[in-house]
């Protein structure tokens, strides 16, 4: 269920301050964050944000198509290694 339009987008204040500081300074270093719940806003376009996935920070380069999505959508938390192969099928 999407967030109500009258409430506006959610973004953690500490992340917003880091984004504003990077835009003002023209800094291209990745911004480290644990805030997967924050929404991507237009001020973030062109920045690289390192989003924590529970184990490491995954660098995410923000483009204009990402606006309105959450940062956590671009940093997968689970790795799928495939199902175990059936040993009986291999012998035949």
Swiss-Prot record:
Similarity comment: Belongs to the universal ribosomal protein uS19 family.
Keywords from the UniProt entry: Ribonucleoprotein, Ribosomal protein, RNA-binding, rRNA-binding
Record keyword Disulfide bond present: no
Organism: Shewanella amazonensis (strain ATCC BAA-1098 / SB2B)
UniProt keyword Ribosomal protein present: yes
NCBIfam families xrefs: rpsS_bact (TIGR01050)
The protein, known as: Small ribosomal subunit protein uS19
GO biological process, one term: ribosomal small subunit assembly
Purpose: Protein S19 forms a complex with S13 that binds strongly to the 16S ribosomal RNA.
């Amino acid at each position: 269920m999407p967030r109500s339009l009258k409430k506006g987008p959610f973004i953690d204040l500490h992340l917003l301050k880091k984004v504003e500081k990077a835009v003002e300074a023209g800094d291209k270093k990745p911004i480290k964050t644990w805030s997967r719940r924050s929404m991507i806003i237009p001020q973030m376009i062109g920045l690289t944000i390192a989003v924590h996935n529970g184990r490491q920070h995954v660098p995410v380069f923000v483009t204009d198509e990402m606006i309105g999505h959450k940062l956590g959508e671009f940093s997968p938390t689970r790795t799928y290694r495939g199902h175990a192969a059936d040993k009986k099928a291999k012998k035949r």
